[in-house]
């Protein structure tokens, strides 16, 4: 099979969903901005050679409906003969897009793909139009569709304290802010115009969502939001609501070499796995175990890890059971994560992969793991290797 390489990986800034920077920017525009940026950044690439575009999005309705991948591609000026499809594996959608493109390359169904994803959670809320089949109650508790309650359950099962959650969340903001002021995020962000609080046009090239003033002390004052009586999960220890997009240029190694394009990493292995919907946040553990086995690796071989921070109460059990607790400060989410940046559902898979790849280059790391939980009990994971 052909080797799959990532040639470029970028993202938009993350904007607050409630009256934030992109309140007047549509999801298609966020997506098209990155698609066109991929082409501008890689002039050796003839866009007519692109086989297909795989674009993750969860709430495929309103401005995100009717195949947003194709709509955005047309807005971006991608040649009309290039296909585009919207992919949905809930939180793992854009990582699934990467997996789909990778498999297509491996079996010879194309050499050049753009992948990515978007979610404008300010324009299309996560719960918009959701209508679960009543019959699901026979096998899945109703609370399993409420992500915050599944985090509460997972945290309780693993003995995760409120203090631990607050410390993890404060770390996320602290590290994300440091990555901003030290210019590390600038390497992955492609800025675009939005509107500031007064309504004036403003060019955003930084994440609006990070709260640098966040401390364990301020977080400790917040009340539990999902289980007000017995819970420990607060808004501050949950991933923020944000709007954003991410994208990658994925190619066969042979075609990248022929075009004189330098690969950043290769896709070493991929996996998805299911778990109990009541503890959906545990999905990264079985997915990672599968991906490592397929790569012939152990967790000790992995130099850097990006774990999507849906909730602190969800992330910490995964870190613990993956055997990363003692090395988390050196290996896991070194630039913070979704608690600070937000989790625009369809965007996050390629967003965390993009951050990971840039960190691997910065730290001269050989092997990296990107993994995330998925609503209703799934996990997805990708192992990357420097080339």
Swiss-Prot record:
Cellular location(s): Cytoplasm
Top enzyme class: transferase
Annotated EC: 2.3.1.16
Gene3D superfamilies per record: 3.40.47.10
InterPro entries: FadA (IPR012805), Thiolase (IPR002155), Thiolase-like (IPR016039), Thiolase-like_sf_Thiolase (IPR050215), Thiolase_acyl_enz_int_AS (IPR020615), Thiolase_AS (IPR020610), Thiolase_C (IPR020617), Thiolase_CS (IPR020613)
Cytoplasm found in the keyword field: yes
Presence of the UniProt keyword Lipid metabolism in the record: yes
Active-site residues, record numbering mapped to chain: 91, 343, 373
CDD domains reported for this sequence: thiolase
A Pfam family assignment: Thiolase_C
GO terms assigned for molecular function: acetyl-CoA C-acyltransferase activity
Biological processes per GO annotation: fatty acid beta-oxidation; phenylacetate catabolic process
Signal sequence coordinates: none
Alphabetically ordered keywords of this record: Acyltransferase, Cytoplasm, Fatty acid metabolism, Lipid degradation, Lipid metabolism, Transferase
Reaction it catalyzes: an acyl-CoA + acetyl-CoA = a 3-oxoacyl-CoA + CoA
UniProt pathway: Lipid metabolism; fatty acid beta-oxidation
Main subcellular localisation: cytoplasm
GO CC terms, sorted: cytoplasm
Domain of life: Bacteria
Subunit structure: Heterotetramer of two alpha chains (FadB) and two beta chains (FadA).
Function: Catalyzes the final step of fatty acid oxidation in which acetyl-CoA is released and the CoA ester of a fatty acid two carbons shorter is formed.
Membership in a protein family: Belongs to the thiolase-like superfamily. Thiolase family.
Protein name: 3-ketoacyl-CoA thiolase
Name of the gene encoding the protein in the UniProt record: fadA
